[in-house]
From Swiss-Prot:
Mg(2+) 2 binds at residue 599. InterPro entries: B-gal_small/dom_5, Bact_Beta-galactosidase, Beta-gal/glucu_dom_sf, Gal_mutarotase_sf_dom, Galactose-bd-like_sf, GH-type_carb-bd, Glyco_hydro_2, Glyco_hydro_2_AS. Substrate binds at residues 104, 203, 463, 539-542, 606, 1004. Its EC number is 3.2.1.23. GO terms for cellular component: beta-galactosidase complex. The gene is lacZ. Na(+) binds at residues 203, 603, 606. The keyword Magnesium applies. Mg(2+) 1 binds at residues 418, 420, 463. Its cofactor is Mg(2+); Na(+). One of its GO terms (molecular function) is magnesium ion binding. Binds 2 magnesium ions per monomer. Binds 1 sodium ion per monomer. The record marks 393 as: Transition state stabilizer. This is Beta-galactosidase 2.
Length: 1029
């Protein structure tokens, strides 16, 4: 250890600890469970704020330097004259200094471990503060930095105190010897890059600074240094033993004792006391400073994500005279996690992981997470039927785990290790020089977090290949904590360093035989020889932009194959940052918007929620697929359904099933039943229906489960599950349409014109298109009605293609190469016939690119005596071109309807491979709500399986998908950010007979399942269109 008295700033800079993988800290205290040092038991029991902890969050003084060598030597003892205020916690890039960098795989610095660039942005923080005189008289005062990116040196009152790296775990230092009465000064030199940055190559914004809490903690001379709590349940789960281990420190602990008291809901359950000294450990004896208790508990209330039953354990350290020296406390959850018979189990029952990956991200605050945002994340997750979260890819803020304990979420706690940009990826994992750094990131995480019942799995990190260092750390984990399984995806997801087969983006039925690390279909994987472990996808369903297609297919597999135990969606929140344009207007920015290089553009936008936590439509698909109730239509006569509960541990004590029978959205009958279902139980319900009268339209039975009472995570009336089925309808014979005045055809060399009362249609002979429709003398079209075979590319269509790199296999590149974004229409035939009751216009167009025919579109337009336009359209597709994104029509309407009314799937956006959550019904929304404001503009807003659409005066009937909004497909295709879109007059209507799925198994390879790709080379569709007075 260096001599602290001789360490000048220049000496520290010369030593360059931040480029030495063998140096991860100087003087940093050992990791331990979070400590509060209450001095009375009651506040510890109540989890009240401890007077022994003092937050140093607030406004510090700050200077930014492009490199540490530019820091003046005097800064250690006094602020620079040009120091500015800096909020702590914060990332300095969010405060106007330096540049945030978004990159996924590529390191943001040249890869030359352990060395980092000489230009190493450095933030110099300082704070003056006073200390309570009583703290100076006795005991120990520490400072705790919960998170500093990426490394820092610390001074107090001009004295160098130490060094630390690892951005996501606490760094704690003893300041007792240097604190003084009156004013004290902290100085913290934070480096943007260090050798540890090579272990922190996560897919996220790369930012710097003191971004988590800073706290002073005062401990008595004799103190509780650490504690560990383990619950041991018998096979019947009706008896438990609470095992608690405490380590003491300081002078005189041999004469002390610790009183352990277990509480539940304020009532004392048990209390025992112990003096220091462990049982004999080996031939050299026992631990003098440690003590262990085992407290038997009969019929414990068990913890699970469904029933987060918590006890409170207080540990009071008593002095020789029985005086309370300090108290530590923690929440305790009695649960057992194990893997048996190839299944991950909690309390003896196989789990189904409804999980999501979550990075700590806030659009204004960067990587600073406040309690309100954490709570909001958990509440939204649970409202949408998530029961698990993976801390991707680093240990989270300490409060996160306490909230997961209390709300009820299963947690994968993941070490801050990712070397994705290394070639090979396992380069550092197989290098013994990097074992100490990797080891600290695993062992310190466990020492901090092991008492949380919500943590059911440890993870060795992410995307770092597989090497000997991983094997060593796996063995350490299994020895240190045999109560939890370990997972690690690197090296193929099924190495000896994982208890769970945990692939990312493996598909349901399709093998991906990559060299060295094949990804088999998940169904195949669990049946491979000698593979007996459960399979839980550590990442799947890449929710980038308008994506998430095929999610229901995964859940069909999970529910059908017991050893397919779910997975973690990638990911929770769009990682966009708030930025202001040249006019001062805020918008959400992604990679490259700050001039950052390298960058991966919008690949940071993979969330189920927008940065402000507004849901993406995909979130509803997740909610529906993961719902805890499944429904079966047993019979229609009598009408009987079966409801099965997917809850493993709780009965339905707050659930009501409501049902309606509706014809074309109009409710014919309804009812409500209180559910009384045991865990994993079934309830059969017979629904008494009145006689249904014959009438036009489809009849649907809709059921939904709501929770009438509010819960800690949801409001009263929260809808948690739903289903619907079509019912047989009484035979209905539609009356013949009334006759009216027939339309009249007039024509010349340029146009065909049809007139009916106050309406007039005009077809252009040169193009063959319907170019105008007058109603009451007013033009209602701003563009012709044209064929539409392309869409503004989705992220999944683009894949990895960008300006400097082209993936010829990406859908968008195939469409571009075929000319589908640059088609011209050539009229081959256009004629009209006057009939007694109608006018028929027949057109034939070829859609071609540079003289090559891609599509042939034949349209038969019938205008009847009711003034209704009937379309009968057949499209033939060339055999040697890529499958199209859509087949349909597009038109720019002059009217801007205030609302949209439709009979079909809704109410939210849905696509052919992402429509499980949508329901058949009649829906009405404002026009603005028909648009989904994806940050990177794409095709959006589709509603599938529509039978009737009303847009102001326009009414369309048939069987089609549609989208309507203020932006053309061309504008969506050419615009890079949502805030740059400009509303166009009127409204754009896209009417689709076919629309390709959006895909979503991943976003870098074609992932639309074949059943959602047009397999035929000819498609015919019909519809009717009228304008109401």
């Amino acid at each position: 250890m260096p001599n602290t008295l001789s360490l000048t700033l220049s000496a520290i800079l010369a030593r360059r600890d931040w480029e030495n993988p063998g140096v991860t800290q100087w003087n940093r205290l050992e990791a331990h469970a979070p400590l509060h040092s209450w001095r009375l038991e009651q506040p510890a029991l109540d989890d009240a704020a401890s007077a022994s902890r003092r937050s140093l969050n607030g406004v510090w003084r700050f200077n930014y330097f492009p490199a540490p060598e530019q820091i003046p030597e005097a800064w250690v003892t006094e602020d620079c004259a040009d120091a500015v205020p800096m909020p702590v916690p914060s990332n300095w890039q969010m405060q106007g200094f330096d540049t945030p960098i978004y990159t996924n795989v590529t390191y943001p610095i040249p890869v030359n471990p352990p060395f980092v660039p000489q230009e190493n942005p450095t933030g110099c923080y300082s704070l003056t503060f006073d200390v309570d005189d009583a703290w100076l008289q006795s005991g120990q005062t520490r400072i705790i930095f919960d998170g500093v990116n990426s490394a820092f040196h610390l001074w107090c009152n001009g004295r160098w105190m130490g060094y630390s790296q690892d951005s996501r775990l606490p760094a704690e230092f003893n300041l007792s010897t240097v604190l003084r009465p009156g004013e004290n000064r902290l100085a913290v030199m934070v480096l943007r890059w260090c050798d540890g940055s090579y272990l922190e190559d996560q897919d996220m914004w790369r930012m710097s600074g003191i971004f988590r809490d800073v706290t002073l903690l005062h401990k008595p001379e004799t103190q509780i240094a650490d504690y560990r709590v383990v619950t041991d349940l018998n096979a019947e789960l009706d008896r438990a033993v609470l095992k608690a281990d405490v380590a003491l420190a300081g002078a005189g602990f041999a004469d002390c004792e610790v009183v352990f008291t277990l509480w539940r809901k304020g009532e004392k359950c048990a209390s025992v006391s112990r003096r220091p000294g462990s049982a004999v450990v080996d031939e050299r004896g026992s631990w003098d400073e440690r003590l262990t208790v085992a407290i038997p508990i009969d019929r414990p209330a068990l913890w699970s994500a469904e029933t987060p039953e918590l006890y409170r354990l207080t540990m009071a350290l008593l002095g020789p005279q029985g005086e309370v020296l300090e108290v530590e406390a923690c929440d305790v959850g009695f649960r057992r996690v194990d893997i048996s018979n190839g299944l991950l189990k909690l309390n003896g029952k196989p789990l189904l992981i409804r999980g999501v990956n979550r990075l700590e991200h806030h659009p204004e605050n960067g990587q600073v997470m406040d309690e309100a945002t954490m709570r909001r994340d958990i509440e939204i997750m649970k409202q949408h039927n998530f029961n698990a979260v993976r801390c991707s890819h680093y240990p989270n803020h300490p409060l996160w785990y306490r909230l997961c304990d209390r709300y009820g979420l299963y947690v994968v706690d993941e070490a801050n290790i990712e070397t994705h940009g290394m070639v090979p990826m396992s380069r550092l994992a197989d290098d013994p020089r990097w074992l100490p750094a990797m080891s600290e990131r695993v062992t310190r995480m466990v020492q901090r977090d092991r008492n949380h019942p919500s943590i059911i799995i440890w993870s060795l990190g992410n995307e770092s290949g597989h090497g000997a260092n991983h094997d060593a750390l796996y063995r350490w984990l299994k020895t240190t904590d045999p109560t939890r399984p370990v997972q690690y995806e690197g090296g193929g997801a099924n190495t000896a360093a994982t208890d769970i087969v945990c692939p990312m983006y493996a598909r349901v039925d399709w093998d991906q035989p990559f060299p060295a690390v094949p990804k088999w279909s998940i169904k195949k994987w669990i049946g491979m020889p000698d593979e007996t472990r459960p399979l839980i996808l550590c990442e799947y369903a890449h929710a980038m932009g308008n994506s998430f297609g095929g999610f229901a297919k995964y859940w069909q597999a999970f529910r059908s194959h017991p050893r397919l135990q779910g997975g973690f969606v990638w990911d929770w929140v769009d990682q966009a940052l708030t930025k202001k344009d040249e006019k001062g207007n805020a918008f959400w920015a992604y990679g490259g918007d700050f001039g950052d290089t390298p960058n991966d553009r919008q690949f940071c936008l993979n969330g189920l929620v927008f940065p402000d936590r507004t849901p993406h439509p995909a979130l509803y698909e997740a909610q529906r697929a993961q719902q805890f109730f499944t429904f079966t239509l047993v019979s229609t006569s009598p009408l009987m359904i079966e409801v099965q509960s997917g809850y493993l541990f709780r009965p339905t004590d707050n659930e009501v099933l409501s049902w309606t029978v509706a014809r074309d959205g109009k409710v014919l009958a309804s009812g409500e039943v209180t559910l009384a279902i045991a865990p994993e139980g079934v309830q059969r319900l017979e629904i008494a229906l009145p006689e249904l009268k014959a009438g036009p339209g489809e009849i649907w039975l809709n059921v939904e489960v709501r929770q009438p009472r509010a819960t800690p995570w949801s409001p009263a009336g929260h809808r948690c599950a739903w289903e619907q089925w079509p019912l047989p309808a009484p035979l209905f014979i539609a009356p013949p349409a009334s006759t009216g005045e027939p339309p009249v055809l007039t024509q010349n060399d340029r146009i065909l014109e049809v007139t009916h009362r106050q309406q007039r249609w005009q077809f252009d002979r040169a193009s063959g298109y319907l170019t105008q429709w007058w109603r009451n003398g007013v033009e209602t079209l701003l563009s012709p009605v044209t064929d539409n075979v392309s869409r503004a590319p989705l992220d999944n269509d683009i894949g990895v293609s960008e300006a400097t790199r082209i993936d010829p296999n990406a859908w968008v590149e195939r469409w571009k190469a075929a000319g589908m974004y640059d088609l011209t229409s050539r009229m081959l035939h256009c004629e009209a016939e006057q009939h007694a009751r109608e006018v028929v216009v027949t057109t034939l167009n070829v859609l071609e690119h540079r003289g090559r025919a891609l599509f042939l579109s034949r349209k038969i337009w019938r205008l009847d005596e009711q003034g209704v336009l009937h379309g009968d359209i057949q499209v033939d597709i060339a055999s040697d071109i890529p499958k199209p994104a859509r087949i349909g029509l597009s038109v720019h309407l002059a009217e801007t309807p205030e609302k949209v009314d439709w009979l079909g799937l809704g109410p939210h956006e849905n696509y052919p491979d992402r429509k499980l959550a949508a329901q058949q019904g009649r829906w009405t929304l404002p026009l603005a709500d028909m648009h989904t404001p994806y940050i990177f503009p794409t095709e959006n807003g589709l509603r599938c399986d529509t039978r009737k659409l009303v847009l102001g005066a326009h009414q369309l009937n048939g069987a089609f998908h549609f989208s309507v909004g203020r932006y053309s497909q061309q504008q969506l295709r050419e615009t890079t950010h949502h805030h740059l879109l400009r509303e166009e007059p009127g409204g754009w209507l896209n009417l689709d007979a076919f629309h390709m799925g959006v895909g979503g198994d991943d976003s870098w390879s074609p992932s639309v399942s074949p059943e959602f790709i047009l397999q035929t080379r000819q498609l015919r569709y019909t519809f009717s269109w009228q304008q109401n007075p």
